[in-house]
């Protein structure tokens, strides 16, 4: 076929991407993987994780304080909607004093870019920091917390 200059024409397929673009302007990464805090309520990390149980899925959203690595607050629901992170943020804001204005660091998922969440955060005087797109090490302390929690409390257990 090559001698007769016959070639197979192939169509190059594009990779599928669910990325639909930015839904709001991204804020800078103020943390830069430095997860150290001298005092409580200086640097918070937040993320959402899911648990698969026999009845379906449960979504857990929490705020972790970098001072001691413990959760400040958390919420869980069966549907990952705005109420999940808004309720969690409400609970966290309730424990702050007038002198506390922590940086709250998150990844770039839509939960932390909804106008309601942004407005709530700004009213409380919180400074937002975001990871780079698709860069999980930028929020590794929070991801690590979820990993330890699942290993110690969830995996290898029967929930039926």
Predicted regions and their residues:
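Charged DNA-binding/catalytic regions of mobile-element recombinases
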Residues: 1-160
């Amino acid at each position: 076929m090559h001698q007769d200059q016959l070639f197979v024409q192939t169509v190059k397929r594009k990779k599928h991407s669910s990325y639909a673009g930015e839904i709001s302007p991204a804020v800078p990464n103020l943390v830069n993987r430095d997860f150290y805090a001298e005092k409580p309520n200086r640097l918070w990390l937040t993320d959402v994780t899911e648990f698969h149980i026999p009845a379906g899925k449960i979504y857990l959203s929490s705020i972790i304080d970098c001072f001691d690595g413990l959760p400040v607050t958390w919420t869980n629901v069966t549907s990952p909607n705005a109420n999940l992170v808004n309720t969690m943020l409400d609970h966290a804001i309730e424990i702050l004093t007038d002198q506390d204005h922590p940086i709250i660091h998150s990844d770039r998922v839509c939960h932390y870019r909804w106008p309601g969440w942004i407005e709530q955060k700004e009213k409380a005087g919180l400074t937002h920091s975001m990871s780079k797109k698709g860069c999980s090490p930028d929020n590794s302390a929070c991801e690590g917390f979820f990993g330890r929690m699942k290993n110690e409390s969830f995996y290898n257990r029967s929930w039926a």
